[in-house]
């Protein structure tokens, strides 16, 4: 069996090295082949053993570090969280009496709040009455505004509608009186003028006198 140095073996992919030279012959060749087989077997198996030892060595510190380092951290974290939860659970128990004490105080505050509402409503009624009084002073009643409109002579407000109607009737009466006075004056002037019969008599009077005088002549 001849082996070339540096040849790769397909199943294990390991490099095989021969330490002793191969000689031609029967006995030495068999010895060398046996020795080479043993070396090959040792070379093939030795990396596996080394790998297994390396894996065991690599796994050893990890298996020792895990139970020593990691669990205390988790335990401390769990203890801290549990203590925080206990504190948070203890705070509502302390605050609950204050809430229970504050609950019966609501009706008192409500009663106190209702009293100012009553006061404010009375105050509002007073202010409304005062505002109504001011508005009545600023806007007088129609009866009171009649004198003011008559004195001022302005009859454009809605409140003084009756006054404006009364004033219009008075003006109409005055106009009628003026018209009647003018008509009476005209009639008096016409009455002062002589009637047509008198005019005729005046015209005919001189004619008769002339005739009479002519007949006498």
UniProtKB/Swiss-Prot annotation:
<dbReference type="Pfam" id="PF15765">
    <property type="entry name" value="DUF4694"/>
</dbReference>
<protein>
    <recommendedName>
        <fullName>Protein TNT</fullName>
    </recommendedName>
</protein>
<feature type="compositionally biased region" description="Low complexity">
    <location>
        <begin position="128"/>
        <end position="139"/>
    </location>
</feature>
<feature type="compositionally biased region" description="Polar residues">
    <location>
        <begin position="20"/>
        <end position="36"/>
    </location>
</feature>
<feature type="region of interest" description="Disordered">
    <location>
        <begin position="1"/>
        <end position="217"/>
    </location>
</feature>
<feature type="compositionally biased region" description="Polar residues">
    <location>
        <begin position="207"/>
        <end position="217"/>
    </location>
</feature>
<feature type="compositionally biased region" description="Polar residues">
    <location>
        <begin position="45"/>
        <end position="61"/>
    </location>
</feature>
<feature type="compositionally biased region" description="Polar residues">
    <location>
        <begin position="177"/>
        <end position="191"/>
    </location>
</feature>
<feature type="compositionally biased region" description="Low complexity">
    <location>
        <begin position="91"/>
        <end position="104"/>
    </location>
</feature>
<dbReference type="InterPro" id="IPR031520">
    <property type="entry name" value="DUF4694"/>
</dbReference>
């Amino acid at each position: 069996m001849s082996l070339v140095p540096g040849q790769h073996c397909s199943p294990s992919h390991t490099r095989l090295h021969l330490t002793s030279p191969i000689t031609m012959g029967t006995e030495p060749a068999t010895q060398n082949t046996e020795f080479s087989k043993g070396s090959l077997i040792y070379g093939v198996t030795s990396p596996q053993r080394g790998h297994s030892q390396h894996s065991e060595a690599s796994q050893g510190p990890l298996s020792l570090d895990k139970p020593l380092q990691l669990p205390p951290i988790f335990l401390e974290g769990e203890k801290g969280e549990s203590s925080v939860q206990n504190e948070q659970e203890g705070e509502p128990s302390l605050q609950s009496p204050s809430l229970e004490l504050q609950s019966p105080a609501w009706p008192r505050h409500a009663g106190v709040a209702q009293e100012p509402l009553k006061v404010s409503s009375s105050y509002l009624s007073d202010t409304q009455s005062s505002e109504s009084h001011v508005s009545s002073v600023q806007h007088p009643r129609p009866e009171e505004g009649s004198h003011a409109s008559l004195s001022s002579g302005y009859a454009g407000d809605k409140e003084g509608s009756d006054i404006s109607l009364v004033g219009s009737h008075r003006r109409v009466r005055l106009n009628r009186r003026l018209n009647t006075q003018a008509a009476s004056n005209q009639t008096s002037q016409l009455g002062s003028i002589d009637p047509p019969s008198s005019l005729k008599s005046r015209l005919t009077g001189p004619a008769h006198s002339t005739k009479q005088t002519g007949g006498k002549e």
